[in-house]
C-alpha cells in the first residue's frame, strides 16, 4: 500500500500543479488574448461544468465496468487534450465545446480516481488516504498558482500559452504516473438497474447536503475577495494572505483531522461540527466591515479564514467517509461520480447565489449563508442514518450474474 499511496499522491500532485497554473490565468487568457467578454467566459465555463456534472455518473459507471485505472488514464489524457485545444479557440462556440469537453473529462477523472482509490485501499483507510491526496492537491495548486502568477506578471500571449502547455503536460504526466499502479479488476456485472445511484434517494439527499456545504468554495475564492475590496478597510493583498493561510491549513492538518473519523457516526458528527464552525466564520467575516482600521479588518479576516479552514477540514473528512461507506463496493465509480456532482454544482451555481446574497444583503446575507451551513450540517446525521438503514434492508439484487 505504501508504494501505491506514493504513486497516487504523485499523480494528484502533478495534475493539481497544472490546475493551479490554469485556474489563476484562464480568465485573463480568454478575455485578453482570445478576446471574449467576461460574460461569455462565465457562460461557457458554467455550461462546461453543467455538462461535466451530467457526465460524472456514466463515466464513473464506466470505471466500475472497465476498470478504474484504465478509465482514469484515458480521462487524464482527455483532459490534457482539452486543455491543449484551448490554444485553437478563437470564438465563443468553439470555446463552449472545449469547455464542455474539459468539464466532462475533469469530472469523470475525479470519479475514476475515487473508484481507483476504493479498489486499492481497504475501507478502514480510505478517508485517511483521501486526506493525504487532498493535502497533495492543495500543495500542487499552490505551486501551480505561483507559476501562473509569473505568467500574469509577464502578461503576454506567449506566457499564457506556456501555461496551457504546462497544464496539458501535467495531465499527460499524471496519466503516465497512474499507469504505474496495479490494475483494479472491473466490478462484476450485477442484477438491477445499471445506474443504481440515480434511484438511491438517501444518497441523493446526502449529496445535496454536501453540495450546500461546498458553497464554502466560491465563498472563499470569490465572495471574500469581493468583500475585502468593496466592504472592508483591509488592503487588497490580504486576499493573497488569506488564500495562503487556507492552503497551508489544508496541507498541514487535513490528514490529522481525517484520522479522527472512523465510521459513519464520526463522519456525521464531523459534518455537523463543520456547519457550526462555518456559521461562526460567516459571522466573523460580517464583522470585518466594521471600523476603519486596515490592520483590525485584516486581523478579523484572518480569524474568519482560520475558522473556515477548520470547517473545511471537518467537512472534507466527514464527507469522504460518508461517500465511500454508503456506496456499494461494486459501484464506487458511479456513486463517487454522483457525489462529485456537488463540487460541479457548487462551482456552477455558487458564484451567482452568493454574490446576490452576501454582496447584495451585506451582514444579513452573511448570517443567512451561515445558517445555511448550520442547517446542512445538522441535517447530515439523520440523512446518513436513513441511508444506512436503506443499505441494511437492500435485497440481494446486487449479486453478480453471469455474463
PLM feature segments, named:
Residues 1-50, 202-246:
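Helix-loop boundary and gating motifs at the non-cytosolic
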Residues 53-90:
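Conserved MFS/SLC helix-loop-helix module at the cytosolic interface between two early adjacent transmembrane helices
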Residues 54-67, 152, 252-271:
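Helix-to-loop junctions at the C-terminal end of transmembrane segments
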